[in-house]
């Protein structure tokens, strides 16, 4: 049985290669901590990770049963999260707390990638009459951090904060194609069935070969209907200053008579926008945009003033 993608935050620590470069399961890098050495901080975040759209409220007893810790330990962790504002009591249950709303607002206003991307995404939406998404890689999750949407596009809204399938769709495939080989091998060991089901290959060599083709091409176009009926997507990678993959610029369009041939799609505009975003983010990382720092400080002063 394959492990669920959303719970695979430590996959890369348990695979490696032998001297002949063959895939070996169960090997940990020497720099990794022992499997049993789980810190209290990790366990606190294990509690926070229980909360989802499927189950937004948890009692102490439910969390204790799910995490298999003592009730007193789980209660102590919940109390810590409540004190930090990350959880809040709802009757005898607990849900996400107001501090998360505050942090989300802070990210919307100050996230460097989001700030440089918003004008370009809005321009692309108007030019292409399409939904434009800014996707961010987070461990083994890919999350929408901004969406430019218009109901006239005919594409359902995705929504900020929504995660996408890790092995399906243009976004996931273009991001996977730029992950380090070691991480891809770990993913394959743990998700071979899901990878085959997504059409990415029924062997490690096939999986690696398919992703190599995407990487060489520099973009990926999904099949119509792969994730949404009548919709196809174009995704181009976004990189940090050291050329590590951090996410993608993704465009969703309804078919409505459009061809899925790459020479008839707005690839040039999407690739240019993604390239510009990578350059802008690299400039921010290298400290070349001091004006953004000044703007953030000004914004902080404004937000600190009472209403």
Functional labels for PLM-detected ranges:
Residues 2-110, 114, 275, 279, ...:
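N-terminal helix-turn-helix
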Residues 2-14, 18, 154-229:
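Short, solvent-exposed recognition segments
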Residues 50, 66, 116-127, 133, ...:
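Amphipathic alpha-helical regulatory segments at dimerization interfaces
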Residues 98-190:
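Amphipathic alpha-helical effector-binding/dimerization core
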Residues 206, 217, 229-231, 245-307:
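Juxtadomain coupling helices with adjacent low-complexity linkers
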Residues 232-236:
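Short hydrophobic beta-strand micro-motif common in sensory/regulatory domains
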Residues 238-241:
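Sensor-regulatory modules in signal-transduction proteins
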